[in-house]
């Protein structure tokens, strides 16, 4: 499976190589990310609790434990108010002990991570409050988690492209000068994950993440 870091590098290179009409902005962020419960269904041959699992998983984000939660994006502003770009987020979900006991799993997590890669569109309102520029964005893309599943039926550990992903963002950027800025934002992702297991089974789950991000941006 191709490492998602190479995928985002190629996507960003293609973006920057395109003709620049106005402004290119590179942003990096980290923050606190959580995930609500989600239903997990599928098949897990050899699972000593249920080989056709169907349960609600309780997820933990653990944003500041290695590997930490982070993201970065490249945006091309084609006008003062409209832009588009590519974004990569390294989020994480860990199941709790109760969830693993209920489903018959020793390990059930997407922790390196549940990687979300999207193409986004943005709308901003420049200098709406002095040096503060509010913005909103949304995008479509793919989920590339590092699937870590272990039960009596076997072990799965590796990157997979598991399905579609959606992203919504709302935030504000404070301009330090014409080049550098800092920002804070709320970000939501939804990913539809169909994960293959090495024992021939499969698990499905729609996973939502909610995050409060802070970051720095460089424009040129």
Predicted regions and their residues:
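N-terminal signal peptide c-region/cleavage motif recognized by signal peptidases
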Residues: 17-19
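Short glycine/proline- and aromatic-enriched beta-strand/turn motifs that initiate or cap beta-hairpins
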Residues: 21-76, 213, 217-219
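Gram-negative (and chloroplast) outer-membrane scaffold detector with strong preference
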Residues: 75-152, 210-220
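Residues that define the transmembrane beta-barrel architecture of outer-membrane proteins
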Residues: 66-70, 113-117, 132, 160-166, ...
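Bacterial N-terminal signal peptides that target proteins for export
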Residues: 1-8
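Strand-connecting loop/turn motifs
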Residues: 21-25, 32, 79-81, 129-133, ...
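Extracellular loop and loop/strand-boundary signature of outer-membrane beta-barrel proteins
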Residues: 57-60, 102-110, 150-159, 198-204
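Predominantly the C-terminal beta-signal and adjacent terminal strand-loop region
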Residues: 38-39, 46-53, 59, 176-220
